[in-house]
Swiss-Prot record:
Belongs to the triosephosphate isomerase family. The keyword Phosphoprotein does not apply. This is Triosephosphate isomerase. Changing W168A: Reduced IgE-binding activity by approximately 30% compared to wild-type, but still induces human basophil activation. Its main location: cytoplasm.
Amino acid sequence: MANQRKFFVGGNWKMNGDKAAIDGIISFMKGPLNADTEVVVGCPQCYLMYTREHMPANIGVAAQNCYKTAKGAFTGEISPAMIKDCGCEWVILGHSERRNVFGEPDQLISEKVGHALEAGLKVIPCIGEKLEERESNRTEEVVFAQMKALVPNISDWSRVVIAYEPVWAIGTGKTATPEQAQDVHAKLRQWLRDNVSPQVAESTRIIYGGSVSAGNCKELAKTGDIDGFLVGGASLKPDFVTIINARA
């Protein structure tokens, strides 16, 4: 079944980079990339247009956040319409740093996802559990609740890529083993089968994030339900090409 879902690798630059750094990233992104892998990079808002104008056309560009309405008195926010006006077609929503540093709750994230889809963007909603939640055997409870909040606002699953990112593995150097990651991905796919539809379960890509590196990407990519990666720090380095080519 996995080979019916196109492998997907997203890079999340977070609050990193300037034009000189972006130029460096663009130079190594011109290297040989597996044509069977869809690639998207998420850059800071102020560099959306610059990145889109200079990045090779076969690589998508994502914003790292947006708000749930088209315009208005929401200082510091950007709308999906603005992202599209910059020539970009993707947005990352609900990243653990948005949830845990900025206090965004499940319902707000769901509303953002819904509006972004209505506005014509493709969306990467992020879910994942904290270390204490995993250690208390609450992983399924947490990620299923996050999924349950998302579902009512998802109007078009073909434009959604779910990113499972265990919070305890983001930027810590700790990585879920391929077995741990595959286990959660398989359970998420079964949840979609039971709560949305078998078709959505089989067609929706579920990608893994959390200290993905050139050293561990190939083992993770061999599993049946991991359809790609959302990569943080490594997406700023030439190693990102190795990760993109994990299934090559």
